[in-house]
């Protein structure tokens, strides 16, 4: 009799190993998917921020009239160029209106004349009663005449009172009158500044005459010492003057000079050339 073959259990073992490998692969795949999705979300947020910043920059580049415009009006006017033209026309109109308003002289309101108010019927009726009462009181006062002694005393008292009042009123000095104005103008300093009138010999600024000796002063007003070295004052824009020394001309930064200074330097060089030719 041939011996029977034993059955082996390899198939179930292989299946369990495959299942474990599949489960580990799925776990790794899920973790990788989560990492990639998080990175994509972060990149989307960064892209949105960049788009927002670029959008704001482009809006800032536009003129103010278009920025204040509604987007419906912007689209209705047909895009950027037409909207710019419309905004420019509106700006020109506004400037014309403001210029006309500023140029128009100010007209003061005419003072209303105060008309005399006519008395009413009630006041007319009350006035005769008042006049009657006044006449009665005057008659009573006239009936009682004061004696001569009382008259003299009253006259002396009135003279004394009037003298006191006139003395108080007559003592008004310029300093007393200025005290009333201090509330409006403010108090003057204790020590009044003294100005030397010999400094201001000319009424206004003037250009120095030909071959006139000129002395330089600082911003504080103190005179500056004379310089042995040769220098040139070159007028520039906004009333500024650039001083160029003979020793510093070679190391001068030309880019800092404006166009007016360039023109003045060229004119000076041409004049100096003529003068040097005459000296030869």
From Swiss-Prot:
UniProt cross-references to Pfam families, sorted A to Z: Borealin (PF10512), Nbl1_Borealin_N (PF10444)
Leader sequence segment: none
GO cellular component terms, A-Z: chromosome; chromosome passenger complex; chromosome, centromeric region; cytoplasm; nucleus; spindle midzone
Record bears the keyword Membrane: no
Ranges annotated as biased composition (Basic residues): 140-153
Localisation: Nucleus; Chromosome, Centromere; Cytoplasm, Cytoskeleton, Spindle
Keyword vocabulary terms for this entry: Cell cycle, Cell division, Centromere, Chromosome, Chromosome partition, Cytoplasm, Cytoskeleton, Mitosis, Nucleus
GO BP annotations, alphabetical order: cell division; mitotic sister chromatid segregation; spindle assembly
InterPro entries (UniProt xref): Borealin_C, Borealin_N, Cell_div_borealin
Lineage: superkingdom: Eukaryota
Region (Disordered): 140-187
Function comment: Component of the chromosomal passenger complex (CPC), a complex that acts as a key regulator of mitosis. The CPC complex has essential functions at the centromere in ensuring correct chromosome alignment and segregation and is required for chromatin-induced microtubule stabilization and spindle assembly. Contributes to CPC function by facilitating loading of the CPC onto chromosomes.
Subunit structure: Component of the CPC at least composed of survivin/birc5, incenp, cdca8/borealin and/or cdca9/dasra-A, and aurkb/aurora-B. Interacts with incenp (via N-terminus).
Extra information: Was named 'Dasra' in reference to the Hindu mythological deity Dasra, who acts as a harbinger of the dawn.
Family affiliation: Belongs to the borealin family.
PANTHER family: AUSTRALIN, ISOFORM A-RELATED (PTHR16040), BOREALIN (PTHR16040:SF6)
Protein name: Borealin
Organism from which the protein derives: Xenopus laevis (African clawed frog)
Chain's gene name: cdca8
